[in-house]
């Protein structure tokens, strides 16, 4: 019996919505990354984007365990000499709550063109409102 290999044109990408309120950041991000990659589908193929679209709402209400709220530091560089910037989880969740989930999920996806295409299927919103009602997303309990 031959091994099934998914073709990019035959893959069906579904839309799912996840409520991040009260969920742990790492556990939530790991499941989202797995679904963006398509590992939950029987037709998963490593070199084809078989994953689904994921909408995350209430990103501002995600939680972390232990002292990570004050100790976890996010770094980015401005591309100017000496331009490394840092911000703690507490400050980032106030300033841009979407970035906490995006950063966690991006680190769990493959690096390269396929991983970047998978990451584009992630839509994160700080509040409960999202503009994707036309896609009729299904509720996903994680």
UniProtKB/Swiss-Prot annotation:
CC per GO annotation: cytosolic large ribosomal subunit
GO terms for biological process, alphabetical: negative regulation of translation; translation
Keyword GTP-binding: no
Any Pfam family matching the protein: Ribosomal_L13
Keywords tagged on the record: Ribonucleoprotein, Ribosomal protein
Subunit structure of this chain's protein: Part of the 50S ribosomal subunit.
Function noted in UniProt: This protein is one of the early assembly proteins of the 50S ribosomal subunit, although it is not seen to bind rRNA by itself. It is important during the early stages of 50S assembly.
Family according to the record: Belongs to the universal ribosomal protein uL13 family.
Name under which the protein is recorded: Large ribosomal subunit protein uL13
């Amino acid at each position: 019996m031959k091994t099934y290999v998914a073709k990019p044109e035959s893959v069906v990408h579904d839309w799912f919505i996840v409520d991040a309120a009260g969920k742990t950041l790492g556990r939530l991000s790991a499941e989202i990354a797995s679904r963006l990659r398509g590992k939950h589908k029987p037709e998963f193929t490593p070199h084809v984007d078989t994953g689904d679209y994921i909408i995350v709402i209430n990103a501002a209400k995600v939680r972390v365990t232990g002292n990570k709220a004050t100790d976890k530091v996010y770094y980015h560089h401005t591309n100017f000499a000496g331009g490394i910037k840092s911000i703690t989880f507490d400050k980032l969740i106030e300033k841009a709550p979407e970035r906490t989930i995006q950063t966690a999920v991006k680190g769990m996806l493959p690096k390269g063109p396929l991983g970047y295409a998978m990451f584009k299927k992630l839509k994160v919103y700080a509040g409960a409102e999202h503009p994707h009602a036309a896609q009729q997303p299904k509720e996903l309990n994680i």
